[in-house]
């Protein structure tokens, strides 16, 4: 005997709504309608309930311990990278205690006002407004930009896009050719002239 017309999976005779109503985990049974609502049923519902933390104290404690484990794992990876880098560069191996103490020293020294002032002073460039310094700065910038873009040739007006050697060789070639042509014209018998 096949399934009844009321359902395709069968078991309709055994199904009781009362059992579902009394079940503590009825959301698991009606998962599609309650936990993954769609359309107008999704209005006002938190559709990302699954990505949020749990509310029981044991679940919160386990999440916190997982976060601590993750932090420790990342710290171990960084220390391992430091050791491998020191080994590759031929430096002495840093100990774990030295790594943690150097991190603490770095944190305390970067927060001091004196260090921040000295860093700011060392990074700031002196911009004197005297004409000599201004001229020197402009010359330096000009040579830097000329060197960068190959525009140092622009300052010599006799140069073309051709190299000096090529330009001279072609100029000499053309002038010699023109001279030969002129000489031939002068000595040719078909002048029709004298």
Curated annotation (Swiss-Prot):
Residues 133-169 have a biased composition (Basic residues). Residues 175-194 have a biased composition (Basic and acidic residues). InterPro entries: MMTA2_N, MMTAG2-like. It comes from the Eukaryota. GO terms for cellular component: nucleus. Pfam families: MMtag (PF10159). Disulfide bonds: none annotated. Residues 53-63, 98-111, 119-132 have a biased composition (Polar residues). Residues 52-71, 86-194 are annotated as: Disordered. PANTHER family: MULTIPLE MYELOMA TUMOR-ASSOCIATED PROTEIN 2, MULTIPLE MYELOMA TUMOR-ASSOCIATED PROTEIN 2 FAMILY MEMBER. This is Uncharacterized protein C6G10.10c. It comes from Schizosaccharomyces pombe (strain 972 / ATCC 24843) (Fission yeast).
